[in-house]
Structures are given as structure tokens and as C-alpha cells.
């Protein structure tokens, strides 16, 4: 298995925490989203590309597994990889770890569709983005990990 690629590094702030004292689920989603845009940029599907070419990406499936609480002051890192890329659809994974202990805090599997911004209809990725995405394909075991 080829290693996942680091796509985000950050910290849990006090205002990210809920009444139970740990990072609220909305912040997991937000941090995974930031990792997504870094992964897309590595493929050439950056926000600049989307704006200039009149394209968009739509998330059509997102599955998060929460494994360990993160608390205010904890640092975290997200590593990502493409699981599969087809002409119009990409499936990818994010793995969020506590940066100090290395423990997995959460995993996220997403499916995205490349589309026209105004037509809102799926369209093929340009070949260069498809090729770049293929170079980032990784295998990933969503089972119990240490």
C-alpha cells in the first residue's frame, strides 16, 4: 500500500468544542473539506481551474467514521488518497490522526462528481486531471486501525 498524502494540518480550538468538551462533528466535516480542496489542487482541479473553466465539483456521498475524540489544543493531520477515479467521478479517502499520538480520530470516504458550473450536469475530467488523479490512487483498509 502506498502512503496517503498529507493534505491538512491544524489544531482544535476551544470554540470547535461542544458541550461534551470534544471537537463537534461540524468541524470534522470542515477540516475534511479543507483537505479535499488540497487533494483536488494536487490533481489540477483547483478553485482557480474551476472558476476559469466554468466547472464545479459536487459531493454526492460522504461517510465519516469517528474513532477517537479530539480536544481543545490537540493538533491533527489529515492524509488523503484517491480510491478510484473514472471519467466523471472520483472516490477518495481522508484519514484524520492526532498529530502527537498518531491515533486515528476519524476517516472519511467521499464520492464527488465533476460537472459544468451552469449546466449542473456531469462532465468528464480533462485528461490531465484524470491522469493526475490516477497517480494519487491508493488502497485503504477502513477496518480497525491503530
Spans of model-derived segments:
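Terminal targeting signals and extreme-terminal segments of soluble enzymes
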Residues: 1-77, 83-146
Amino acid at each position: 500500500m502506498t502512503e496517503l498524502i498529507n493534505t491538512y494540518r491544524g489544531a482544535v480550538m476551544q470554540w470547535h468544542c461542544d458541550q461534551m468538551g470534544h471537537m463537534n462533528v461540524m468541524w470534522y466535516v470542515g477540516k475534511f473539506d479543507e483537505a479535499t480542496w488540497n487533494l483536488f489542487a494536487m490533481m489540477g482541479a483547483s478553485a482557480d481551474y474551476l472558476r476559469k473553466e466554468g466547472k464545479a465539483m459536487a459531493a454526492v456521498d460522504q461517510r465519516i467514521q469517528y474513532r477517537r475524540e479530539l480536544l481543545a489544543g490537540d493538533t491533527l493531520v489529515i492524509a488523503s488518497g484517491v480510491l478510484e477515479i473514472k471519467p466523471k467521478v472520483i472516490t477518495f479517502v481522508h484519514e484524520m490522526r492526532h498529530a502527537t499520538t498518531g491515533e486515528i480520530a476519524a476517516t472519511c470516504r467521499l464520492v464527488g462528481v465533476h460537472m459544468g458550473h451552469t449546466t449542473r450536469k456531469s462532465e468528464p475530467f480533462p485528461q490531465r486531471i484524470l491522469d493526475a488523479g490516477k497517480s494519487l490512487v491508493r488502497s485503504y483498509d477502513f477496518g480497525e486501525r491503530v
